[in-house]
C-alpha cells in the first residue's frame, strides 16, 4: 500500500528582489502622442498614418506587401525608400487605399509620382469596378512635398491631404 506520509517537497529558493532600473519608469498617465514628429529625421510617416487612422475610418486595411505593390504599383518596389507605409483594403468593394513614401533620393520623386498617378487613373478607368469606388478614386489625392509623397483614396481624401501638406508648412 502507498505510504500515508506526505511527500517531501523542496521549497523554492528565495530570489533577490529585482534590481532598480536606472531608466525612468514610463509615465502611465501621459497620453501617447499621435502627432507626426517633425525633427532632424523629418516626418515620421507611420506616426502620420496612426494619427489619421484614429481620426478617419480605415477599417479592414492590411499592409501592402511586395506582391501587392508589384501588382498595383509596378516599379514602386524598385525605388529606394527611406520610409514606406502602404495600406490597402482587404475587400475589393472598398476603395480605401493609402501609400506614404519618403524617397531616399530626390531623383526618384517624379517616377514615384507617375506610378501613383497611373494607379489612380487605372482605378478611375474601371479598375475600381464599382461606381462608388470609381467615384472615390476620382477624388483621390496625390501629394508631393520634397521627397515625401502620398496617395490617398478615401471619402475624406481632401482632408487627409490637407493634414499631410500641413506637416510641411510647420
Feature-to-residue mapping (PLM):
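Mature, Sec-exported extracytoplasmic domains of Gram-positive
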Residues: 1-170
Amino acid at each position: 500500500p502507498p505510504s500515508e506520509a506526505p511527500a517531501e517537497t523542496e521549497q523554492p529558493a528565495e530570489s533577490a528582489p529585482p534590481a532598480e532600473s536606472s531608466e525612468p519608469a514610463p509615465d502611465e498617465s501621459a497620453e501617447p502622442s499621435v502627432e507626426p514628429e517633425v525633427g532632424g529625421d523629418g516626418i515620421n510617416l507611420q506616426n502620420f498614418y496612426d494619427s489619421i487612422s484614429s481620426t478617419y475610418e480605415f477599417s479592414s486595411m492590411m499592409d501592402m506587401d511586395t506582391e501587392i505593390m508589384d501588382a498595383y504599383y509596378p516599379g514602386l518596389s524598385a525605388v529606394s525608400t527611406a520610409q514606406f507605409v502602404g495600406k490597402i483594403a482587404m475587400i475589393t468593394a472598398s476603395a480605401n487605399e493609402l501609400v506614404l513614401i519618403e524617397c531616399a533620393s530626390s531623383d526618384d520623386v517624379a517616377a514615384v509620382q507617375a506610378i501613383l498617378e497611373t494607379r489612380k487613373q487605372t482605378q478611375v478607368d474601371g479598375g475600381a469596378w464599382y461606381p462608388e469606388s470609381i467615384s472615390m478614386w476620382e477624388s483621390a489625392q496625390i501629394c508631393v512635398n520634397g521627397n515625401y509623397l502620398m496617395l490617398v483614396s478615401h471619402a475624406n481624401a481632401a482632408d487627409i491631404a490637407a493634414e499631410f501638406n500641413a506637416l510641411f508648412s510647420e
